[in-house]
Amino acid sequence: MNIVPELKNRESPLVFNEKNVEKEKIEALIEAARWAPSCFNNQPWSYVFVRGGDSTRKDLEEALSPGNGWAKKAPILVAVGAKPDEDCDMNGLPYYAYDAGLSVMSMVVEAEHLGLRTHQMAGYDEKKVRKALGFHESQRIIVLIALGYEGDVKSVWDKLEQRIKDRLAQPRTRKSTEKNFFFASFGNQHG
């Protein structure tokens, strides 16, 4: 099945090239994220782009979980926050987080389109990120994203844990459609 190549070819690299990301590309990423859909058009997200030389970079890096230490080499780290109080009050569900995810996905697809790579991370200390970057206490930190041009994994191969090497050696896969997609009712495979 043919789909948009930016979706099919997206990967989350562990190694980034040191090359700086051009200002025009960052602006395009911001526009892509900005135009994402959101419940009642609330747009509850906030993005902070942190470059290697920024004064907040060291504190942000210290907020990463040990397993995400590789992200320190990325030219840009992006923190995405969202405000629960700007949520749609529908069915008790956290639409602010869903909306932020839509915005992130829009940015990720645009990054792929521009020849950039992203690696989204859940491994971080939310309080440390909030303090390092000045997010308001009312904001939740939804995700951190390493952003840049993909580097050569061979340059760090000897330093990788075996479980990571094993994962990288496998082709990228997805669950079969029969496990997640149904018609008319849950479990119904017949469309």
Task: Give the location of each predicted region.
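Acidic, surface-exposed loops and disordered segments
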Residues: 1-191
